[in-house]
Each structure stands twice: as structure tokens, then as C-alpha cells.
Amino acid sequence: MDTTTTMAPLPLLTTTSLLLFFFLASSFAADVVVAGGGGGGGGYDGGGDGEGGGGGDGEGGGGGGGAKMPHVNHGRYKCGPWVDGHATFYGGRDASGTTEGGACGYKDADGYGAMTAAVSPALFDNGAGCGACYELKGDSGKTVVVTATNQAPPPVNGMKGEHFDLTMPAFLSIAEEKLGVVPVSYRKVACVRQGGIKYTITGNPSYNMVMVKNVGGAGDVVKLTVKGTKRVKWTPLQRSWGQLWKTEANLTGESLTFRVMTGDHRKATSWRVAPRDWTYDNTYQAKKNF
């Protein structure tokens, strides 16, 4: 809990201290957005390995030729039930101090804005909960939808349910600043994003890091695989921390396709989202999302 709040001091482990630590760890990531190249650019996936928007696995990736992979209609994400929790806030009235990193590895430029939250360890789930969206309702009946972008301290003593440490703009949407800590009802809801899924690739040919962001639907990525157009077959990545995924496979020199699975076990495949001449420290955006 930030010292600007009026509630009694929390233990030394605060969202702010966690934020500073993970900001240092994530400072290497770049955010130069490059348009998704070649192929079909992305879309829902039914689990098959056929190419979308190009002919077979050959290099090039033009948008014509070849049979396109059919899109599967997964329907809308089903909201979870309302449960009890509580909310505090950290950072300034303009959300300053909340966007420079965090335990998910997101940065301010990643487009999540001021309506974000650090969530308690159970919801954070060692990074698997990053990117999920929650609707919170205060005693006044007002609601706000936030994205999980950081890890909060454990639940506050004497309060029910899980802890949401909100940015101040999000907190003020449902409660008065002077209250400091308030009971809320919350539920997991669909994430509505602008544009396609984004993949930031950093590292080197021996150790690749991929940040996944701007994911719609369930929002939380639980599995990520990559496929090239020549030597790289479908290869699972391992979670490094937050929404940063790693692989030691050499991905250079090939168009890259990423397949994302979210917490509700739905999949989306971004076909050839990174062109053959992709470079490190750039972000590649698919044409579609969940």
C-alpha cells in the first residue's frame, strides 16, 4: 500500500516496493511497434497445424494462394461469479508510480492505461494471472474494470477475500480517497482490446524472450508456442516471469507464428506475425485477437 493512503500501514512488502524491483528487471524491453508481416496475421485457432493465409510452410508468406485455416467461433468469454474482496490504492491521482514496470513486465507504452490493478498472490498466480480483467463494484454500486498488471501484498487483515491494489484513478471510480481500504465485490470479465495480440521479442539467438500483451478474451496467457517456416517446428516457451516467456531455440531467419492459449483454454494463432527479417527489441502485432 502506498503511504498516500489513509489506512493503517501495511507490512513492509508493498506494491510500490514490488513495482520498483520488477521495473529494474524489465527495463531492457523495447516497445517499437512493427506491423504484423506476411501470412494471415492471426485469428482463432481450432488446434490444427495448417498454415493460414499463405501456401504451406514455404518462406515468403504472401496473403494469397493456399487454403486458409477456418476460423472457429469460440463465442464470448463467460464472466465469472461475483465474490467478496477488498481494494486499496497506490500511486498518484494521475496513476504515476504505477506504470513503470511491475511484476507482469508490462510498461506504460503497452496500452493498459490507468485502469489497472496489482492483485493478491492467489490471483497473480506466479504470473499466470497477468493480463486478466476484473470488474469491481463498491458499496455505492459504482463499478470499474481493471487489468491485472502487478502483484499486490497479501489480503489486508480483517478484510474479506482477495486484495486489489488499484491505481488511484481506478479506486476513485468506486470509492472516496479518504476511505483507504474498502470492501468490494469482484468478478473476472472479458478483456476488450484494441487491435491484435502483440509480441515483443528481446534477447539473442541463444536465449529468446517474448512478452505477450494486448490479449483479449480471458486476457491471461497460460501457454505460448512458436513455429518457424523452416527448421523451427512447434516449440513451447517457458514462463520466465510475469508475461515474459523464454526459449533457447534459435528463431532467427524465419517468419514466426505464435499460438496463445488463455486461462479458459481457448487458443489464437498469429500466423507469421514476425516476418523473416524480424529483429530483436521490436514488437510485432497480429491482425486479430480473441
UniProtKB/Swiss-Prot annotation:
Glycan attachment residues as annotated in the record: 250
Membrane topology value: Peripheral membrane protein
Alphabetized InterPro entries for the sequence: Expan_Lol_pI, Expansin, Expansin/allergen_DPBB_dom, Expansin_CBD, Expansin_CBD_sf, RlpA-like_DPBB, RlpA-like_sf
GO cellular component: extracellular region; membrane
Positions of the UniProt region annotated as Disordered: 45-67
Domain of life where this protein originates: Eukaryota
Tissue specificity note: Expressed in flowers.
Pfam families according to UniProt: DPBB_1 (PF03330), Expansin_C (PF01357)
Domain named Expansin-like EG45: residues: 101-196
Keywords: Cell wall, Cell wall biogenesis/degradation, Glycoprotein, Membrane, Secreted, Signal
SUPFAM superfamilies attached to this UniProt entry: Barwin-like endoglucanases, PHL pollen allergen
A single BP term in Gene Ontology: plant-type cell wall loosening
Segment forming the signal sequence: 1-29
Domain Expansin-like CBD: 206-286
SMART domains, per database record: DPBB_1 (SM00837)
Subcellular compartments: Secreted, Cell wall; Membrane
Protein family (similarity comment): Belongs to the expansin family. Expansin A subfamily.
Annotated function: May cause loosening and extension of plant cell walls by disrupting non-covalent bonding between cellulose microfibrils and matrix glucans. No enzymatic activity has been found. May be required for rapid internodal elongation in deepwater rice during submergence.
UniProt-recorded name of the protein: Expansin-A26
UniProt organism field: Oryza sativa subsp. japonica (Rice)
